[in-house]
């Protein structure tokens, strides 16, 4: 089922709504969890998801999610990290934002129709001869690439590339990570100036996220850690939630650096960097890490929460083209350009937002 068909069942029929949703092509990256040299290192693939709900070319909300696939020989572990979620407050809406985010986030978590190319092995061939002869010879071999732009060669038959994709093992474990911290703006600059945007406290934000996660992770192991506070105060409001975190998988406590994933713009990562500078990283256990984390600047003041959920269910990862037809795929470069353009927009000016959306939609047609 496509994301459009899911969301449009929820939205009111008295307005013109659109979904803007795309993924980046899967790309090989370093693992978000440090893996020691003595153990097998899986291939790690990252996919960036971005969703935005539009109403008459005005952005209402945005959600950015990063998915990491750790590919072992016989299974895959999936890490889902909610990077940012924000609203603009530019439109008065007749529905609740969480009613849209619940199915959208679940769609991103459950999506498995990834087509991943084989990893390119590092070349061990010696460096090319830098002499002019060999450089000219290499350039000549690339000239046919430009033939299609020349009128004389327009009759050449099109080139068809046969792209091979990896046969992936089944998915074994899915983990969801959400770091909640109150802020005026996450994605949309100056949106806090709009009267229609609701700014809430850290505890209210944490409860809001827990309600969303509670509905889309039924049957999962669900944990909450609130550094510096008693997490049970929040957990007792929900069924089948536990106080704590999902970073420790065995009875014997592991080191923090080998157990805790580090994501972009992650306060845990900044603390890890400090431990490296202080030469304490190798001896830092998870329990000690979490205790000291509560005294970090990002965790002082308002309520901050770390939500972690685990699902141990074996599923097949699809590698055919059918599952990706309804999803727009873009390059990482295109994704970064889109995000950077959003950062330059004044979201207190609806005309500027409409102009951006209109131009973007016309550029991708």
Locate each region found by the language model.
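Extended amphipathic alpha-helical regions
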Residues: 14-32, 39-40, 44, 52-60, ...
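Eukaryote-specific long, low-complexity intrinsically disordered regions
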Residues: 1-7
